[in-house]
Amino acid sequence: MKSNAVTSVELELDWTAQTILPIEFRGRELQLEARAYQGADPNFQALVLVHREKHGAHEKPVVRVHSGCVTGDIFHSLRCDCYPQLQAAMNTITTSPLGILIYLPFQEGRGIGLVNKIRAYALQDQGYDTVDANVAIGAPIEARDYDLAAHILFDLGYPEIKLLTNNPAKVEALREEGVEVLEQLPLIVSPSHYNKRYLATKKERMAHKL
């Protein structure tokens, strides 16, 4: 399958394939470049979607590094803000001259995995906040790293980015990997009855810019 942007082909190195992915987003039909990457650990995989306009070749890309969330991204759980953040990020990415989504499905629950996330949710039902719940089940508060995301950005040829995130730790982690974050662009979403305490905890205890 061919397009003006890229040809579908099996690739060498540590990324496995690329193609054109047609999607429907908010009433628009878009054709995005899609690449699948494989990290050193076979469980560490990433899907990269690139939106580029003809005049965007020399722009600094707007980038979202998004941790996978089965409950939020797929089932639209109201307990977190993952789905509305992903939607807001995709809107910005697909209306920018050059935008990139790096989707990391292995980072479920800030890296603690799906089962531990549900265990932590059960404790939150008993009154724990998201930080204390992780501690109570013996899981890290934050278990993610961004070396694969940084590798992807360098592989794509974009060591300088504008990052869509509320999380200053993500900014610093990418900088430690050598990525120059020129600007942090917040993703502000409206809290719901179900996630307002979660968002307050992220702001007060994890320094998120909300």
Tell what function each PLM region has.
Residues 1-210:
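Catalytic domains of riboflavin
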